[in-house]
Amino acid sequence: MSDIGTDGHAVRQDFLPQVLLPRRMRAGGHFTFAKLLEIDEKADRVSTIDNVEAKSGASGQLIFVTVRHEINGDRGARITEIENIVYREAPEKGAKPVAHRPPDLIAQWTRTITPDPVLLFNYSAATSNPHRIHYDRPYAMRTEGYPGLVVHGPLVATLLLQLLAENNPDAVVREFSYTAVGPLFDTSDFRLCGRVDGSAATLWAVDRRNSLALTAQATFRPKTRSE
């Protein structure tokens, strides 16, 4: 198991570049849906590293890695995902997350989510995400210094898409993007919010302090009769 790092991820230098900064997180992503995959359609995914960039922020040194995933079916392109990964220094012990103001918008629909270890573990398994901060509480708290298990940013994005779909059942999403702003943990509830204006949706998630955790945007079209 020498190819597995202490955080659960594969040792860097396999596909992702070797980065010595200890913390890894998903900073955001962008999806373009050219056409839906059909039942029984064969598909393949090709992943490439688009960019690696070093920056300095309030929390210290940052390394941003942009990965492109292209999913192609039997009859051409289906989904393109741009995955934004950030590596950062470990924060000082006892450091509290910075509060971020949510959008100055009136939500048309909201939902409260109570995260728990079962939800986080199942999402890790479904997305092949081995990062221990999502399911190993002693590791998350003692080694990485978090107050509890960390809620996946992509899980929050998925829940926001689900909220959009439930409130707009005839919408077919064309593009979806999200940006992680602050952390969420399994120690408290968080709230999903969203609204639609024309063929675009603004979505966001806030923690119990009403601090912004994740923001997202989607564009969509109405379903056709064949869909």
Predicted region positions:
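Hot-dog-fold acyl-thioester-processing enzymes
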Residues: 1-28, 92, 103-168
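Short secondary-structure boundary micro-motifs
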Residues: 13-20, 35, 53-55, 96-97, ...
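HotDog/MaoC-like acyl-thioester-processing domains
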Residues: 26-115, 184-187, 193-227
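Catalytic-pocket segment enriched in acidic/His residues
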Residues: 134, 140-215
